[in-house]
Amino acid sequence: MAKVNAHATRELDVPTERVLEFLRDYREARPKILTGNYTAYRVEQGGHGQGTVIGYHFAAGGRERDYRLRAQEQDGVLQERDDLSSFVSTWTVVPAGNGGGSSVTLAASWDGAGGIGGIFEGLFAPLGLRRIYAQILDRLAAALGT
C-alpha cells in the first residue's frame, strides 16, 4: 500500500488568526465551505476546534464512503483524523505577503489500495481531490470576504 496525497493552496488577504477561527467553527462556518461532494455532515462532539468530532458522507469519482473525523490542533495546523480509516486531512495556515494575509493549504493523505486498483487510485484520486479542495478554498475565500 502506497501513501496517497493530495493538496491545494490559496493565498487570502485575511489574517491567519481570522482564517483559523473560521476553520475551528465546525457548527456554523465549516458547513458553508463544503462542496456537494459532502453530505450528511454532522457535529457529533464539541463543535469548536480541538476535540471536535464530525462525520459526513463523501462521494467523488464513482466512490463513496463515510468518515468520522477528530480534530486536533497545534501551532496553526488543524488536523482531522478519520476513526474509520487511515485518512487524515490537514489545514495549514501561515502568514503570507507583507499585508497580513495568509497562505492556506488543505491536504489529505491515506493508505492507498494494493494492486492495480491502488495504481489507479494513486494517479486519479489526487487529481479529483485537488479540484474539490480548490473549490473549498474558493468558498473559504468568499466566506471570509476576499
Model segments located where?
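Positively charged, low-complexity intrinsically disordered regions
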Residues: 11, 51, 64-66
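A conserved amphipathic terminal alpha-helix motif
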Residues: 111-146
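Residues that form or flank phosphate/diphosphate-binding pockets in enzymes
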Residues: 14, 88, 115
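Hydrophobic ligand-binding cavity/cleft-lining segments
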Residues: 1-48
